[in-house]
């Protein structure tokens, strides 16, 4: 219903996933504690109240893919932000023998590629944007599946100038996720004019990351020209 109403307003609907994590307080973890990355025989390390799923195991990949795909099949969802906000620790797998534990990291990355390949083939209309704690997954491998990647969680317009300049030395501007964020900036507290924030974001994919109903009218009046 929500997606239909959004579409009726002439807008497309997007969703933000973080599918590579598992909460200890979840039915999935209680049923399959060995699906979390951990050194066999030792307790895993929680971070952000999460463990990382062991994507070196095909059964884990299939399970997570189906969970994501079932949501996308349920409605006209045309954008996905695929996020990964946790470092990998306790690099070990209950699905690999002792002499092949070193394969985990490589197999993990191949599994992410596999899931995103399946996703873009089943949903060819989908705009996929990768993200990992900001721009940690900004690399050619991810760009094969997603035409844009979130450049950095630092959305301060002044700092973004240097971030985007450096990224543009290697990657096209069209790949760099860049938004007009709120003011004062959530991370630095810096106040930057709305026009300046718009100009900086226009050097990337451009979007708004704020509540437009709560910004000053003079700023709101600039939006039609920025998006034209």
Placement of each model-derived feature along the sequence:
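Alpha-helical packing segments of well-folded alpha/beta enzyme cores
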Residues: 2, 60, 64-71, 112-115, ...
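Glycan-recognition surfaces
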Residues: 23-62, 106-213
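Residues at the N-termini of beta-strands
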Residues: 78-79, 127
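Short acidic, glycine/proline-enriched helix-loop-strand junctions
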Residues: 94-102, 126
